[in-house]
Swiss-Prot record:
Bidirectionally degrades single-stranded DNA into large acid-insoluble oligonucleotides, which are then degraded further into small acid-soluble oligonucleotides. It comes from Bacillus cereus (strain ATCC 14579 / DSM 31 / CCUG 7414 / JCM 2152 / NBRC 15305 / NCIMB 9373 / NCTC 2599 / NRRL B-3711). GO terms for molecular function: exodeoxyribonuclease VII activity; nucleic acid binding. Belongs to the XseA family. It is found in: Cytoplasm. Keywords: Cytoplasm, Exonuclease, Hydrolase, Nuclease. CDD domains: ExoVII_LU_OBF. InterPro entries: Exonuc_VII_L, Exonuc_VII_lsu_C, OB-fold_nuc-bd_dom. This is Exodeoxyribonuclease 7 large subunit.
Length: 452
């Protein structure tokens, strides 16, 4: 029988088909620890699930992982549901996850803690960004369910405490998947209106699932971006949501939020009354002081004899005018004298005078230089003539003109003695007008007496 060889692709597809048709492998509940976690830019998640003895590759596509509330991380233990299949390119089997939740910690609780840490690191909870709640808000916006107990408590409290205030309700969903987008849109709408002074965002109590819309990141960022101060009022006093941390002020209950947003009109009336009384008392004291001052003025000399005071002041004015005229004349004379002194100084130190003096000095120096140069030149000329005369007197040519000559040997050395030549040597005799080539035919030696 002839052997049939399978291709790698055919074998891999056969194994994949076997696995995918196994009902036990198409609905698998698995628990393990996440490692090698990667979140692809397209939203898909790739990681490894492992325990103490084994590991399996895992894939969770974006269509499934967008519904999980927490952020998977390396080292996190999870419970997953999925199916087993083969990735043909590598020939490896892996689990394709359809659902995932934390192992040992509630899914929502983990998501809450992760988001809280991340937003706090970004600074969304910082007191630096908290806006002050206006003490006397004219218009109060309320973002909550239009049918719950929270809206009744808020409106009742505001109307009781601050009946002159306006209340605008922005009805929203407060639980379910559509609740968070509904709350975000209401916050944006309130900001766009431009007439809301303060916003109350909240709902009544409930489970963590029912309150979850106020733990969504989009709601937290909408509260942070709001230009209107926001008071959060979610659940009961013990309930804390992400919205509470981001809001400008947290109220333990919706009723407490209304009390923080709306002042007590009775207390305001009492304050107005007290301030009115203080103002009246201050006015009475001021009027009394002015009356006393008026009485003092009425008894004064100026009030009883205004004509005399006027004449005295008129005389003082005349004297002051005379002193002013004299002071003006003295001032003008002083300035005229200063001007004359400055003019004299300027004329004395005018640049033209300095230039003229310098020009005269330069001309004097030039004449002196010319005289000294002329004297030096004459001295040098006289010295040159004397040196030339001495040189001429010592010149061999001058001696030759008197009949003398210079005798040289064959090596052109001057002969100073008959002992320096021998018979037959060639010599040359330099005379005034030429040179004689001679031969020594005889030598006659003489004794010198005193150099003669």
């Amino acid at each position: 029988m002839e052997k049939q060889y399978l291709t790698v692709t055919a074998l891999t597809r056969y194994i994949k088909t076997k696995i995918e048709y196994d009902p036990h492998l198409q609905s698998v509940w698995l628990k393990g620890e996440i490692s090698n976690f990667k979140n692809h830019s397209r939203g898909h998640m790739y990681f490894t699930l492992k325990d103490e003895n084994a590991r399996i590759a895992a894939v969770m596509f974006a269509g499934h992982n967008r519904n999980i509330k927490f952020k998977p991380e390396n080292g996190m233990k999870v419970l997953v549901k999925g199916k087993i299949s083969v990735y043909e390119a590598s020939g490896s089997y892996q689990i394709y996850i359809q659902d995932m939740q934390p192992d040992g910690v509630g899914n929502l609780h983990l998501a809450y803690e992760q988001l809280k840490v991340r937003l706090e690191e970004e600074g969304l909870f910082s007191q630096v960004y908290k806006k002050a709640i206006p003490p006397y808000a004219k218009t109060i916006g309320v973002i909550t369910s239009p049918t719950g107990a929270a809206i009744r408590d808020i409106i009742t409290t505001i109307k009781r405490r601050y009946p002159i205030g306006n209340v605008i309700v922005f009805p929203v969903l407060v639980q379910g998947e559509s609740a968070a987008p509904s709350i975000v849109q209401a916050i944006r709408t309130a900001n766009e209106m431009g007439e809301i002074d303060v916003l109350i965002v909240g709902r009544g109590g409930g489970s963590i699932e029912e309150l979850w819309a106020f733990n969504e990141e989009m709601v937290a960022r909408a509260i942070f971006k709001s230009e209107i101060p926001i008071i959060s009022a979610v659940g009961h006093e013990t309930d804390f949501t992400i919205a509470d941390f981001v809001a400008d002020l947290r109220a333990p209950t919706p009723t407490a939020a209304a009390e923080l947003a709306a002042p007590n009109i009775i207390e305001l009336q009492e304050k107005v009354l007290q301030r009115t009384l203080r103002l009246q008392r201050a006015m009475r004291e001021l009027v009394h002081k002015k009356e006393e001052k008026l009485q003092v003025l009425q008894k004064s000399y100026a009030f009883r004899y205004p004509r005399q005071v006027y004449e005295q002041k008129e005389e003082q004015l005349d004297r002051a005018l005379e002193q002013l005229v004299l002071a003006k004349e003295r001032y003008i004379d002083k300035k005229v004298n200063q001007l004359k002194q400055l003019s004299f100084y300027l004329e004395k130190h005018h640049p033209s005078q300095k230039i003229m003096q310098t020009k005269v000095a330069v001309e004097t120096l030039q004449k002196q230089l010319q005289r000294e140069m002329q004297t030096l030149l004459q001295t040098k000329e006289f010295a040159f003539v004397r040196a030339a005369q001495k040189l001429e007197a010592l010149s061999p040519l001058k001696v030759m003109m008197r009949g003398y000559g210079l005798v040289y040997d064959e090596e052109k050395q001057v002969l100073k003695s008959v002992k320096d030549v021998s018979l037959g040597d060639a010599v040359s005799v330099q005379l005034q007008d030429g040179i004689l080539d001679c031969s020594v035919s005889g030598i006659e030696e003489r004794e010198l007496n005193n150099g003669k």
